[in-house]
Amino acid sequence: MRIISMKDEGTLRIALEGELDHHAARSAIARIGGLIDVELPRSVVFNFKGLSFMDSSGIALIIHTYRRLAELSAKLVIEDVPPQAYKVLNAAGINKMIPTARASVR
């Protein structure tokens, strides 16, 4: 999995590309946690447009990030979620606690 990050005026934008499964989630949690610790953002925007697959391990990444940001009084938003990943987020109720936008249909 590839992680691309960019900070813009207090917002840390993180794009995830590839498969977010058990193996990828573990390293992604560490890497994203490190980015948050260094950047101390007011908000984080996950862009999932490049995700080809996500299982429940992706939920662990989201919850871990959400809790870390809560410690900083920062917000989390998830955008451009592909249909397969959206089903996982919806089944877990993530979209009820974190603003989540589906990928636009083109």
Residue ranges and their predicted role:
Residues 1-52, 64-106:
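STAS-like cytosolic regulatory interaction modules
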